[in-house]
């Protein structure tokens, strides 16, 4: 949806109003009714901005961004078309994540304090502003602090590239800088607490970008294979119909059908019933397998840290613990090796109906 350009005075008024409700009243002792009304108005701000691709900024930008930021183009008007299309794609999955507070997000890949560079800071304001930053479900969200109830800005990571950027600063923190850049969207510059922390942010974002770009590849390959198989079957049936139909002036000939091939392997595994449990040499029943603990890898995953478990697509992994579920990680076992695995890379291996 094309965003409607608002007059500059209205943009700043709406932005100041939203900022006062979100930050100015955050620690005030409000009555329950006032708190509900404050939350209701803030949700209305976010829903309208998302629905109409509005930023309440005369210069465009990302959803709910800082008042000191501006658009890559530096001109007045709505956000770039590509930015609006990105948000319209994400809205199909809902806007719940965009409205959540810093402590309410799930599937968090990386979070922590960073200094974010402002595109157009005020005379008395700092060029670098401290923000609580979170990567979750393909989104990069930044908050005023780790207890904020709504983000000051949000953007989709897909379509960006990330790199270390020591050229952003001239002081002692220059080796701790990194940036996200795109050809048709605004760029984002950050400073971490240390060079090692900055490299970890770059590595995590790079891994996520690689994962997002490869999500459609397996589906496309399987779809092409299915289309080829359907085409071959259709040609075979057409040949059979041609021999069955009567032809004038000719005698029907017997068609030599191909020999039946061996029975194709069933792609589903047959689970044993409780009555089929075998007995060992001592006559005792073997321990019953809990199939609900087994998950299958959706994609290849190469662990970057010693405590991360590496696996390939299709590997059968036994989940030992979901203690770190809130961080998006489980504890799994593969080939007697134990490590943490990203839960978004797994799917249930067995159907539990009738077990």
Swiss-Prot record:
Read off the SMART domains from this record.
PH, SH3
Q: Which Pfam families match?
A: PH, SH3_1
Cite the residue spans of the region called Interaction with FYB1.
286-291
Gene Ontology molecular function: protein kinase binding; protein phosphatase binding; SH2 domain binding
> Which Gene3D superfamilies does UniProt cross-reference here?
6.10.250.220, Pleckstrin-homology domain (PH domain)/Phosphotyrosine-binding domain (PTB), SH3 Domains
Q: Name one GO biological process term.
A: positive regulation of cell-matrix adhesion
Which InterPro entries does the record match to this protein? PH-like_dom_sf, PH_domain, SH3-like_dom_sf, SH3_domain, SKAP1_SH3, SKAP_fam
Sorted UniProt keywords: Adaptive immunity, Cell membrane, Cytoplasm, Immunity, Membrane, Nucleus, Phosphoprotein, SH3 domain
Q: Does the keyword Membrane apply?
A: yes
Ranges for region Disordered: 64-83, 219-252
Q: Anything noted about its domains?
A: The SH3 domain interacts with FYB1.
Assembly and partners are described as: Homodimer. Interacts with FYN. Interacts with PTPRC. Interacts with GRB2 when phosphorylated on Tyr-268. Interacts with FYB1, which is required for SKAP2 protein stability. Part of a complex consisting of SKAP1, FYB1 and CLNK. Interacts with RASGRP1. Interacts with FYB2.
What's its job?
Positively regulates T-cell receptor signaling by enhancing the MAP kinase pathway. Required for optimal conjugation between T-cells and antigen-presenting cells by promoting the clustering of integrin ITGAL on the surface of T-cells. May be involved in high affinity immunoglobulin epsilon receptor signaling in mast cells.
PANTHER family annotated for this entry? SRC KINASE-ASSOCIATED PHOSPHOPROTEIN 1, SRC-ASSOCIATED ADAPTOR PROTEIN
Family the entry assigns: Belongs to the SKAP family.
Q: What is this protein called?
A: Src kinase-associated phosphoprotein 1
| Lineage summary | Eukaryota, Metazoa, Chordata, Craniata, Vertebrata
Protein's gene: Skap1
